[in-house]
Structures are given as C-alpha cells and as structure tokens.
From Swiss-Prot:
It catalyses: orotidine 5'-phosphate + diphosphate = orotate + 5-phospho-alpha-D-ribose 1-diphosphate. It is an enzyme of class 2 (transferase). GO terms for molecular function: magnesium ion binding; orotate phosphoribosyltransferase activity. Disulfide bonds: none annotated. It comes from Bartonella henselae (strain ATCC 49882 / DSM 28221 / CCUG 30454 / Houston 1) (Rochalimaea henselae). It holds the Pfam family Pribosyltran. Homodimer. PANTHER family: OROTATE PHOSPHORIBOSYLTRANSFERASE, URIDINE 5'-MONOPHOSPHATE SYNTHASE. This is Orotate phosphoribosyltransferase. Its EC number is 2.4.2.10. CDD domains: PRTases_typeI. 5-phospho-alpha-D-ribose 1-diphosphate binds at residues 116-124. PROSITE patterns: PUR_PYR_PR_TRANSFER.
Length: 192
C-alpha cells in the first residue's frame, strides 16, 4: 500500500475536508483528514491497518509484545493493527492531562510499538513514549496511518508511516489571511 492508496481510501470515505480547522495539535490547517469517517467503515480500516502491520513487520526486527495506542485517536488503528500482527493491544489514556497506562500492567522491558492514527507534530506519540517508559516498557518504534508532516516530525523513536502526506499547517499567530477569514472548526479529540 502506498500514499496514493491511503489518500484514495480517505477520498472514498469523504474524509478529506476543506475549510479552516484547528488540529488536535493546536495548529491551523485548510485541510482536515477526518479519520472517523474512514474508521466507521470496517473494510477500509482493515485495509489501512493490514498495510500498516505489514510495514511494521518489515521495519521492526525484534519480537513485539504489545501494540499500544493513545486514546482516543489511536484506539481503533492500534487494535486493528494488533489483530493483523497477532499480538495484544493496550492503550494509554489521559489522567489529569497526562497519558498513563492505567488499565493494564506490563512486565518491565516489554517490547512495544505505538500505533497512532494521524501525526502532525508528534506530541501524542512523544507523550505515549514517556508514559510507557515510566511503566517500564521498551518502546521499539511508533507507527501511524498518515504522517501529515511529510516525514519531518521527530517523535523520539523510529516512526513507521503507512503514508507521508505533507499538508500545510500554521501556528495560531501565523495563519494566512485567507484562512483566517473562514470560521475555525476544532474537530480533534484532545481535551475531551
């Protein structure tokens, strides 16, 4: 599966939105990849996560004990990717604003791969790495369906992307005038 295949799946689900969006990262963009519209279709989600699992198998040489997803956005892709890898799926969730592995215990040194939906700044993955290291895990890599940075983001561990698709985004004090004229919509899941 290549980048165009991923974009075609998003198009098939009418999941590429145009307008003025405030992303989960806080950055502004004229394009929003509404993965919820993809994830509501099991057959499309299965295709993406099978492709991601295949890339993980090719990229990670060590045995993986768990796939871990950051709630909320990483829950569905981490679960479906773990199904294709044949290993358990866990998740971290926010407690007082910080990710914690609160519903599970893992053995010290457990080898994990983080799976996220879409990466823009990489903050959720970096926070997930921190939570997992605190819990005693060995984070081998992270993976995402779509890297909006076009491969430029640093998440602190190797990042395996099913697709790299650079989409312009702007700090709140650098939004172009034509974008600022449109009403901003915040469809993301941070602070839910």
């Amino acid at each position: 599966m290549n980048t165009q295949d991923v974009i075609d799946i998003f198009k098939q689900a009418d999941a590429i939105l145009e307008g003025h969006f405030i992303l989960t990262s806080g950055r502004h963009s004229a394009t929003y990849m509404q993965k919820a519209k993809v994830f509501m279709h099991a057959h499309l989600t299965e295709k993406l996560c099978r492709g991601l699992a295949e890339k993980i198998k090719k990229s990670v040489e060590e045995k993986i004990d768990y796939v871990v997803g950051p709630a909320i956005g990483g829950l569905i892709p981490s679960y479906e990717t773990s199904r294709h890898l044949g290993i358990p799926s866990l998740w971290v969730e926010r407690v007082n604003g910080r990710f914690e592995l609160r519903r599970f215990e893992i053995k010290k040194g457990a080898r994990v791969v983080i799976v996220e939906d879409i990466v823009t700044t990489g903050l959720s993955i970096r926070e997930t790495v921190e939570a997992l290291v605190t819990a005693g895990a060995n984070v081998l890599a992270s993976a995402c369906i779509l890297d909006r940075s076009g491969g430029k983001v640093d998440v602190g561990v190797p990042l395996i992307s099913l697709a790299e698709y650079e989409i312009a985004s702007y700090a709140s004090d650098a939004v172009p005038a034509e974008l600022a004229e449109l009403p901003a919509i915040k469809p993301g899941s941070r602070n839910i």
